[in-house]
């Protein structure tokens, strides 16, 4: 870690601005993923390299079944617990990437999000729009969950931890999910702003 910081300074990289994306490539790495994440405070994201992992455990990649349900799930949970982003894509595109229609790509990206993953590395520009759509909460979702937070706060103030709203029962787990949706929307907006600033700086 000390050597990395010195190298970064020597290369003109401002301290605290370097982010590391880890790729888990072996059976041992899956088993020790928490330890690997903890090796540097600069680790920001971690994902499976499913092609190398296939070789490590002697698996032939086939579209008919997903051999990495456990590995992907463990990585997602361990990364989230460590406060870094788990990234990756639902089977079979992790080992057998290919071009898909916009709708098909949106489904795969949505499946990936629902596996606990927080982003996807896009090897082709055609993936980007569908991936962004899948991982970004819609305005209606943000509006709904903002109302959920308001309604739940009022319920807590009134002395109850469960209240009906819009045909649903709002309780602590729903309020916690509302926090996640709103925080994700805020993070996506911030990243879009950062990208726009970078594009403007590059074209100046």
For the regions a language model picked out, list residue spans one by one.
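Expand to "…catalyze enediolate/carbanion chemistry for C-C bond making/breaking, isomerization
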Residues: 1-204
